[in-house]
């Protein structure tokens, strides 16, 4: 894993051997790597530079990399990221903090946005609330799991999926890699206005997609902090996911991994 403190404390590379998962800046010089946004998207576009693109301060403490942004004048908050690896299961734990730097009560939710080259298969358990909006993506729902198989022929515009999840994980399979995010599951009622726990975005030029998860939308008193932990797993896995048996096999593998089973 590589982190660029000079560009919003982004995670800019995640590899297994020579296989890169994340979208690189050579493909899109603005939207690449993985970052944290503040939800809901009241800030419009682009994201506040001081949180998304400006330099973060850095320190190392107890084998963890700790990154801190400045305070954004619009959102009245700052972001801190603490990242460390776990030797036992070769995962990475990312602890995000959003700190209210105003003198009034504000409401936020954390929003992790991870950009990868367009392609592959993305899947996650469907929550009780299901889709919050009509999805523009061609998805398959089978035995409680939402499956998205990328097909460039079906992409003719920006496309997005909004869904309430379950079990607290999202997985993405490429030709050679299986990537899994584990995070605290939230209910429909805990989602930020106009947002959902799981969101997928496909760029209209078919070059990249975003794997997005969000945490609970909460009120913060002045100087209070949201703390949100996400765990990443990356495994080399080339199995196809086309038949029911193949889907069952990969689901069993993912669930064992996120539950800490051998």
Language model feature labels by segment:
Residues 36-38, 111, 232:
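Tryptophan-centric aromatic hotspots in well-structured domains and transmembrane helices
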Residues 13-14, 66-69, 94:
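Short hydrophobic/aromatic-rich beta-strand segments that constitute the beta-sheet cores
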Residues 1, 5-22, 90, 101-109, ...:
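A contiguous, surface-exposed recognition patch within enzymatic or periplasmic domains that forms
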Residues 246-262:
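Short peripheral tails and domain-boundary helices/loops at the edges of structured domains
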Residues 80-82, 225-229:
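Well-ordered beta-strand positions in beta-sheet-rich domains
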Residues 1-53, 251:
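Acidic-aromatic substrate-binding/catalytic surfaces of carbohydrate-active enzymes
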Residues 41-90, 105-108, 119-121, 204-207:
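Extended, loop-rich substrate-binding clefts of extracytoplasmic carbohydrate-active enzymes
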Residues 97-98, 232:
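Hydrophobic beta-strand positions in extracellular immunoglobulin-like domains
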